[in-house]
Curated annotation (Swiss-Prot), chain B:
The keyword Repeat does not apply. This is DNA-directed RNA polymerase II subunit RPB7. One of its GO terms (molecular function) is translation initiation factor binding. InterPro entries: NA-bd_OB-fold, RNA_pol_Rpb7-like_N_sf, Rpb7-like, Rpb7-like_N, S1_domain. PANTHER family: DNA-DIRECTED RNA POLYMERASE II SUBUNIT RPB7, DNA-DIRECTED RNA POLYMERASE II, III. Belongs to the eukaryotic RPB7/RPC8 RNA polymerase subunit family. One of its GO terms (biological process) is positive regulation of nuclear-transcribed mRNA poly(A) tail shortening. Component of the RNA polymerase II (Pol II) complex consisting of 12 subunits. RPB4 and RPB7 form a subcomplex that protrudes from the 10-subunit Pol II core complex. DNA-dependent RNA polymerase catalyzes the transcription of DNA into RNA using the four ribonucleoside triphosphates as substrates. Component of RNA polymerase II which synthesizes mRNA precursors and many functional non-coding RNAs. Pol II is the central component of the basal RNA polymerase II transcription machinery. It is composed of mobile elements that move relative to each other. RPB7 is part of a subcomplex with RPB4 that binds to a pocket formed by RPB1, RPB2 and RPB6 at the base of the clamp element. One of its GO terms (cellular component) is RNA polymerase II, core complex. Its main location: nucleus. Keywords: DNA-directed RNA polymerase, Nucleus, Transcription. It is found in: Nucleus.
């Protein structure tokens, strides 16, 4: 009881070491009253017998001393722990470090890793820092992937158009998902088509990145899709984030990703989901395999499924993006000798991006006002120079109509006259597209 | 720790079960109701082992349901602070690892893993000592000490540590 009270008091004192020494002396003295100094004054005659006796007593003292010391130490440790423990996180409302029950929910939830797990900001940044070092040591970066329209396309069975119903007979077996690409998920009333090249894409990307899935779908859907993409659980093990795990509604954020923002690449088809992390984003051309998906985005054209067509396996969007990833990865790790930790993948990404349309001088002609600023920004990010007045240095005139003054000028001066889609395509594929595919037809 | 204790419960039974098999019905319903549940006081009910006594039923007005007070013996499992448990690792990540001992979910954070063990990422994430002699990965069996417990209606959460003498891996699946 005495010890307890001392320990309870100890936090009050600012410097506890002196107190502790006094306390220790006191305790040790109290526990070994037999070894008092007057024993030293025994006469020489009795030395022999006393020595034996002393030895006995000493050995008792020693054990007593060490046990009481042990108790003190333990108590001290406990008290220090209670004082020092910053409660870096919680699991089932208990501190993950000291086991103490914590009331009130604070920190960021990491439900996608394990139910009931929460971590505090400092702990997250500590984990990010330590992880960063080992990751860079393995020459890897982080990669956050979206599911729908990026890696695959899903539709409700009820939304299949009549021209698509033939697909029902062509679905692949769920017994070995690693071979197929079209799956019917009866219990979810859904059909899912994986984007061509996705398996090679993930395999290649996993060598360069630690990968996360981040989807706006709900958790059961996200896990089901992860199972289709990664049946062995080798890429996305406990790294599947769904909308239930995000911290903000209708937004995706890197706060739940345990990776430093300067080392994260994102692949998504929806730019506005990543308002805070646009610099990390690689925008993906949407994959619309099913008609319901086309309708959802307001396209009236036939779906790939209706046309019985699909993206190219070796030269589709994913294959093109993989080349960009390889380039970014290579640039990041091969850059001159500055410290790896100080490098920022966002800078690498923007420098790679700015070479796409490098050397192009663009002038816009009669582009719809609402679309102009974003188009101009896109072109500038891709490295093109945008002018407002006609100039001999202009290489491309971007217009939707061949009848404008600038369009005439382009034809006369033998400059490229292209549709705005030329810029958009370059933005998606990270490659200057052949201009002849984007020629504007004369209006009748 | 396991305990063999006597608990009591009021069982509501639908009139359709009245008849010759009333007792059997009552017992099977009891098992269905309580086995696998948790209570903060007693822990996880592993199995009903016997019926001590079934009291007189009370017919409820209006519904015809009958309430029987049932005293039953059962085996319960409850982890305690300071208890040493053996558990199977279910997940390893940079924050630490999760392990299971029956219904109990235990988290051992990397603060409570010995400092000489380092996290190794990859398709089989693990914690390994610098000389590679000890490895904790999924399906490893570990001996750990409980430093905190919380019992919910259906789950028991524990915080564990292996930063102490004689704790850690007891059976490594990789070497078997």
């Amino acid at each position: 009881m005495k010890q307890m009270s001392v320990v309870a008091d100890s936090p009050v004192h600012s410097s506890s070491s002196d107190d502790f020494v006094a306390f220790l002396d006191n305790e040790l003295g109290a526990s070994s009253p037999d070894s008092s100094p007057d024993k030293e004054a025994e006469s020489q005659d009795e030395l022999e017998s006393v020595r034996i006796k002393r030895r006995k007593i000493e050995s008792i003292d020693e054990t007593e001393g060490s046990t009481s010391e042990g108790i003190i130490k333990q108590n001290l440790e406990a008290s220090v722990e209670v004082d020092v423990c910053t409660h870096p996180g919680s699991f089932g409302s208990m501190c993950i470090r000291c086991g103490q029950k914590l009331d009130g929910e604070s920190g960021v939830t990491f439900g996608y890793i394990h139910k009931g797990l929460r971590l505090h900001e400092e702990e997250i940044s500590r984990l990010r820092n330590t992880d960063m070092k080992s990751l860079l040591g393995h020459k890897k970066l982080y990669f956050v992937l979206d599911l729908d329209h990026t890696l695959l396309n899903s539709t409700l069975l009820a939304h299949l158009s009549s021209e698509e119903s033939y697909l029902l007979n062509q679905t692949d077996s769920l017994a070995d998902v690693s071979k197929g690409s079209l799956f019917k998920l009866e219990h979810m009333h859904m059909m899912t088509k994986l984007r061509p090249f996705v398996r090679s894409f993930l395999k290649e990307a996993s060598k360069m990145f630690e990968m996360y899935i981040y989807t706006m779908g709900d958790r059961p859907y996200a896990l089901e899709m992860a199972k289709l993409l990664d049946p062995q659980g080798e890429y996305f093990n406990a790294k599947v984030i769904s909308r239930d795990d995000g911290t903000q509604k209708h937004q995706k954020g890197l706060d739940v990703v345990l990776g430093q923002e300067s080392a994260v690449l994102i692949l998504d088809d929806t730019e506005h989901a990543w308002m805070k992390h646009k610099d990390n984003l690689i925008l993906m051309e949407r994959y619309h395999f099913f008609a319901s998906s086309c309708r959802q985005f307001g396209f009236n054209c036939k779906s790939l499924a209706e046309l019985r067509n699909d993206e190219d396996e070796t030269d589709g969007a994913l294959a093109k993006i993989l080349r960009v990833l390889k380039q970014v990865h290579c640039t990041f790790f091969n850059k001159h000798q500055d410290d790896l930790v100080d490098r920022d993948v966002r800078q690498v990404l923007s420098s790679v991006r700015s070479k796409v349309l490098g050397g192009c001088v663009i002038i816009f002609s009669r582009i719809f006002h609402g679309a102009l600023p974003s188009l101009r920004k896109m072109a500038e990010q891709l490295g093109a120079t945008c002018l407002t007045e006609v100039d001999p240095s202009v290489t491309h005139v971007v217009a939707t109509d061949a009848g404008t003054e600038k369009s005439w000028w382009a034809v006369k001066e033998n400059k490229f006259l292209v549709h705005p889609r030329w810029i958009e395509a370059a933005n998606y594929f990270w490659e200057k597209q052949p201009e002849e595919n984007f020629i504007i037809k004369k209006k009748q | 720790m396991f305990f063999h204790i006597v608990l009591e419960r009021n069982m509501q039974l639908h009139p359709r079960y009245f008849g010759r098999n009333l007792r059997d019905n009552l017992v099977s319903k009891l098992m269905k109701d309580v086995e696998g549940t948790c209570s903060g006081r007693h822990g996880f009910v592993v199995a009903v082992t016997g019926i001590e006594n079934i009291g007189k039923g009370l017919i409820r007005d209006g519904t015809g349901f009958v309430t029987f007070p049932v005293k039953y013996q059962c085996v319960v499992f409850r982890p305690f602070k300071g208890e040493i448990l053996e558990a199977v690792v279910t997940m390893v990540n940079k924050m630490g690892f999760f392990a299971e001992a029956g219904p109990v979910q235990i988290f051992v954070s990397n603060h409570l893993i010995p400092d000489d063990m380092e996290f190794q990422s990859g398709d089989m994430p693990n914690y390994t000592t610098s000389d590679g002699s000890v490895k904790i990965q999924k399906d490893s069996e570990v001996r750990l000490k409980i430093i905190g417990t919380r019992v919910d209606a259906t789950e028991i959460f524990c915080i564990g540590t292996i930063k102490d003498d004689f704790l850690g891996v007891i059976n490594d699946p990789a070497t078997v």
